[in-house]
Each structure stands twice: as structure tokens, then as C-alpha cells.
Amino acid sequence: MAAEGEQRATSDVTKALARHLNCLNDENKMIRRRALAAIQKEAADEKLASAVLQHVFLELLKPLLRCLSDPMEKCRELSIQIIVYCVSHVPRPEEALPYLMPALTQRLGQQQLVELSEELRLAMVELLTLLVEVCGKKLAPYLDEMIQIFQRTMVDPFPDVKKESCKCASNYATCIPEHFHMQAESLIKPLMQTISHQHSKVRVAVIQTTGTVIQYSSGKSVDDVLSHLAQRLFDDSVQVRQAVTVVVGDWLLKLQDRYSFFHKLIPLLLSSTTDEIPEIRKLALDYWEKIGSQWEKENEEDLKDKLDFSAPCPSYYPAGVQRPGLGCRELIFRNLSKILPAISRDVTNWVAGTRIKSSQLLAVLLLHGEDHITQHMELLLSTLYHSCLDEENQVVINSVKSAELIGTFVNPEVFLKLILSALQKSPLASHLMTLAACIRGCSREMLKTHLTKITSVISQSDVCQGSERVLYQEQLLCCIQSLIDVCQQDCTEVSLQCMNVLITILASPASESLHKKVQDTLLSLSEVQGLNGPHDLYRQHMQQLLDWVSQSHNHWTSYSVEQRQFEVIATESGPVMGETLHLFVPILKMCLQPTREPQMRLKLFTMLSKLLLKASETVNSQGQLHRYSESFINDMIVPNLKWQAGRTAGAIRTVAVSCLWVLLQSETLSQQEILQVEDNLMPRVITTLEEDSKMCRLMSCCIITALLSTCERQLRPDKLNKIYPELLKRLDDASDEVRVAAAKTLYQWFKCITDEYERTTYKGHLEFLYRGLLVHLDDPDASLQLIVLDLLKEGSAVCPSLLVQEIEAVRHKHRSPAYCDQLLHYIQKYTSPTPTECT
């Protein structure tokens, strides 16, 4: 009875639809549209039983499929809607497949776009997704048609069509895995064409579908997609990177032939463990732990010994880092030789992002590889030598981290042999950077037996003087800092070699930016030895340091590193220099001979001048400088006061005069010691009054004043007569400062006149001097006039009558006789005839 009822209902519906079906062939598009709308209304009648709808659908199917090619878009849309409704409501939708699949293939699977409407193409792909859902395995015979459609829709211009196609393909692969693998590779090309689409949601869909397609394929296409997936690890979209992580993680867990792809897939997953997003890092680590555990269980027999006698986590393991499980470590051990060459290439890739990712991955691999990385040391070190100099700071940071891990896991005997050998052959900043990082990663116990070897190499002149670039010097300093930080008081045995390196760094032109760091390192070196500071270090090694730099002092030039090292030792050792003058002075004496290079002498005199300015804190810290005063003056300063042509020679004379002036000012020399050198010194200083340098002339006046003051009443008349003419000339100097200084020196000169200076015999000298001074009593500079007035008052006591005679001779020539009258009044009032009055 039920069957008869269904037949009657089917017959009634068919009769009701007959007229509408006929109208579908009408030329008028509006009639066709109304007919389809009516059919849709009838088909969607909720009173229809599913069995009745099944019969009606099969009756309607062919006319509806013809309508898929209708010129009117609305008609095509209604047709698709009716088919979708029927497919989702009939009990046996698979019966429509023989007609439906060819029609969909014709509309979607052609080389050229047949359906021009994006929305309708999307609707048809959604219909296809529905068919996969309701028909399942019944779609297996239509594998070729489905693949043909996917190949076109995955590269469709409309993003939504791409996404829906990916969804449909994933579902289809899951439904018929036993058949899908035969055609799976056909989808790789369209998927890879779409994987870099501008919409992130499309990229996510493509990646997810690629994962499913490969999962249900023969695995031959893994190599074809790896490079594309690797690129997506650099994607700006978090969702895209997350999708790659999930896909690769699933492959490593579930892919049928996954063992043969471990060395290719593991780097992709481990790259995600260093992602900037915490969620992705956690996701990747969770996958990695599962993969390691699964592999461990699958290979339990091979790992039996390691599982039963597992070694505890090494005590020197990096702080704050959790040790990976045995399975994870073993996976890396066994695949490291295949992974490292590729990583090494990528670390030097021209794309910055690739270099950063690769350097991050290298550190992760080394953490897993532990002592197994020893066999790959040459490749690892050559890679780090390049990456340590990368222009990207993040690459450098990651490379240094990798080098520290090498120091942690590899025996120092191994890495030192390779690094030190490379350093000796070609000293580069990258070699030093790698060495410093390896040292930091190493344990004190392991490293202490190699201290001498390390410091003997880096203190060699070819290495510590290998480059004057800041980066090189900075890494040289890092090596010493690392040794001190790791080995602490063990550094006592190599303290001298460390000092040699640090002094060389300070002697470098690049040292200005590193000076504070070097001083801090010297302080650390002294502290680990229980000393009170850098000065104690210099005190401990001064003999060896000066022997070290002075080996070639006979051949020093201004470009000699040893000369700069000598300067550093002299200026940085502070009071220790005063304790070792017996070593310091002979070197300085040899290097300041007039036959030596002028530029070098200039540098050394400048250094000496600075030391003498703080004599009590440096060269005279022990109060012993006076013992060497004669050598300083006669052997170093005086020979360099001799006139020679050239600007450099002039500069040397100026700085030599400066040293002499500072030495005299320091009050380290007694009167007796000054008298011993005065005979040799005074004539040389007088010649410097003619120097082009105002400063030199000024200091020369000051020096002569000091010498006259010290030797007061002990200078013979003939010496005095050689001094005043040059001073008188300086009263006409271009510099007012020099004129004033010369006048003050003449004031001191008059004080040196004793009864031994016979006025009658030397009357001509006094006349010449008085006349010259009287000229300047009428000087345009009022301040100088006053100074000369005081000077003549002092000098009037020598021969008053002669001075009165000279004043009266020029009084009428002066612009104002006031000063002459004042001077005459002074002479009449305060002076008395001398025992040897001029006649």
C-alpha cells in the first residue's frame, strides 16, 4: 500500500512539473526563470517523502543539468540550488552521479573558464563538497573527473573557489584513501601554484590540503612541496606558519614512508620551535616530543641499552634549557650528517630571513646533537666563521649561541686544534668570535689544561696585531674576558700573556671605544689573582712587559706597534713606572736620539710630557726621578732642542721644551742638580726663543726665568751677557704673552747681577739693555709699559748713573715723559752709587 501511495504521489508531482519542464525549452528567458522557480518550489515541498523526492529528482536531473548551460545566470543559479537541495535530501544521491559528474566536469574542469560567474563556480564546488559528504566512497569511480575539476578550481581566479576546492579535495582524499593515491600527485602542481596566494586564508587552505594529499599519496611528491613549505615558515601570517607546523608534524607522525623523509622534514618542524609566536613554539615542541616518543617506541630494541642505562643530564648542560628526550636526540644523531650540509648552505643564503632561520635551527640541532657533533666540527666551524660576520645582528647572536654549544659538548682538544690552527693561518674576527664563544660554553675543569695553549696563540704578534679594525680588537678582548670568566684564578699562570694581549688592544688606534672595557678586563684579571687592581698587575709583570716591547726598540718608528705598546705601559702603569725607572729610562733615551724618526720622537715626548704633569703619581711616585734628571735633560731633551728644518722638527722642539718646563715645575730637581745641567741647557733653551711656536717661545722664557732663579748669583757675567740680547728681542714679539714673559725673565736677569759683574767692563752691554728697555717704556701697550717700568726700577740698581743718562737722552722722544720722570724720581730717591759705578 505504501508503495502504491508513493507511486501516486510521484505521478502527481511529475504531472504538476510537466508543464514547467516544457517551459525550460522556451526561448524567453523570463519564462525559463519562472519555470525553474516553480520547480524549486515544488521540489522543496516539505510534504514530499524522501522516496518521492528521489524519483522526482531523477526525472528533473537531466533538464536541470541542461540548464547549467543556460545563457541567463539566474537560471543557472536556480538550477544549482535545486540540485543542491535534492542531493542533500534524497536517500540515494549516488544515483545521480552518472549524470551529475560529467556535467560538473564540463562546467568546472575545462582548460578555459566555462562558467563566468564566480559565485556560480563557487556554488558548484560547494555542490561537489556536498556530494563527497553524502556519497563518500561511491565517488571512487569518478576519481579522474574529480581530479580534473580540482586541477582547475584550485587555480581559479576567485579566492573562495580555491578555498572550497581545497576543502573538497581534503575530504575526498579522506573518503577514498585506497584509490586517491593513484592520482594524488596530479594535485601537487596546482596546489603549489596557489600556495603563495596573497590571501592568507587561501594559503592556509592550500597548506592543509597539501598535507592531506601527501598523507594519502605514495609519498613521491614530498620533495616537490618541501621548498614551498619552507618558504611559508617566513610567512607574515601566524595562521600560515601554524598550518605548516601542523602539516609537517602530522607527516612525521603518520606518513607511511616517514623514515626516509626524516632528514628533510625535521628541519622544518624544528624551525617552528624558534618561531616568534609562543603558541607556535609550543605546538612545534609538543609535536616534536610526540615524534621522539613514537620513534623511541618503534625502535625500542635498538635503544635498549640506552634506555636501560640512560646517562643523566650533564652538569655542564646550558642553564635554563630542558634536555630533549632520548628519541628526539637519537633522531638528530642519526640524521645530522644529512641535515648539516643544507643548513650550512642556508646560513650563507643571500636572503636575510633564510639566514636568520637557518642560524636559529643550527643552534637547536647542536643542542640535540650533544657530543655527536664532534665528527662534524670542520663543517660547523667553517659555517660559523662565515655567519659570525653576517650583517644581520640576529644571525650573529644565533651563531655565537651555536659556538657556545660547541664549547659545551665538544672536547676542547678537538675544537681548539681546529680554531687555533685557522687563527694562526688567517687571523680573522670571526675566528676570534667563535673561539671566545666556545670558551664561554666550556667548563672550567675541561679548559684549564689548555689555557697556556690558547693564550700563547692569541698573544702571538701575528694574531693580536692581526687587524686594527674595531671588530677584530673587540673579539680579541672577548677571548680574554671569556678565559677570565670561565677559568677564574687558573688564569694566574697565563696572566702575562693576557696582559700582552690587553696592552696590544690599548695600543691599537681602535682602542678609544674599547678603553673602558679593557680597563674592566684588567680589573677582573687582577681580582681573580687576589691583587688590588691593574697597577698591581703591572707591578707583577713590569720587567717582562718592558723586555717584551723593547726587544726591537732600536728599530722603532712611529708606525711600530711596540712603540705604542710602550706608551700604553708607561701611561697606564701609574705609580709602577716610578718603581722601574731603571728599565724605563734607557729605552726612552735610546728612542729619543736625534737620529731616530721625528714622528716617533714627537709621540714619545708627548707621552713624557703627560707623565711629568703628574710626576708624583707616575715617574716620581718613589721620589727617585731626580737620580735620572741629568739623563733626562742632557741625553733626551737637550739633543732635541737643536734646530732642524721642518714642521715636525719644530713640533719636537716645542714638546721637548714643554717636557723641560714640566720637569722644572715638578720641583723634583734640587738646586744642585739644576746647576749640574745648566751649562749644557741654557744655550739650547735660548735658541728656542726664536721658534715659530708661540707656546714654545713662552715656555722658553719661563724656563730661563726658572733657571735664573735657581742659579741666582752663581752665573758668570759672560753667561749673563749671552742671555739678555735674546730676551730683549722677545719684547718685540708678535704675542703680548711672550713680551710680558720676556720682561719678567729680564727682571730675574737683573737679580742675578752681582759685584762680579764689573759695570765699567760691561758698560756697553748695560747701555744696550737700558736703551732697549726705554724704547718699550713708551710702548703702545699700557700694561707692558708698567711692567717695563718695574723692570727698569729693578735694573736701576745695577748702574743708576748710566740709566739716568740714557733716560735724559730719550725723555723728549717719548709721547709722554711721565714714566721717565717717575723712573728718574725713583732712582734719585732709592738708589745709591754702586761699588763699581759706571764712569
UniProtKB/Swiss-Prot annotation:
Keywords: Cilium biogenesis/degradation, Cytoplasm, Repeat. GO terms for cellular component: cytoplasm; dynein axonemal particle. HEAT repeats lie at residues 10-48, 54-92, 94-137, 140-178, 181-219, 221-257, 259-297, 578-617, 675-713, 717-755, 723-761. It is found in: Cytoplasm; Dynein axonemal particle. InterPro entries: ARM-like (IPR011989), ARM-type_fold (IPR016024), DAAF5 (IPR052623), HEAT (IPR000357), HEAT_DAAF5 (IPR056497), HEAT_type_2 (IPR021133). It holds the Pfam family HEAT_DAAF5. Its main location: cytoplasm. One of its GO terms (molecular function) is dynein intermediate chain binding. One of its GO terms (biological process) is cilium movement. PANTHER family: DYNEIN ASSEMBLY FACTOR 5, AXONEMAL, DYNEIN AXONEMAL ASSEMBLY FACTOR 5. Belongs to the DNAAF5 family. Cytoplasmic protein involved in the delivery of the dynein machinery to the motile cilium. It is required for the assembly of the axonemal dynein inner and outer arms, two structures attached to the peripheral outer doublet A microtubule of the axoneme, that play a crucial role in cilium motility. Interacts with DNAI2; probably involved in outer arm dynein assembly. This is Dynein axonemal assembly factor 5. It comes from Xenopus laevis.
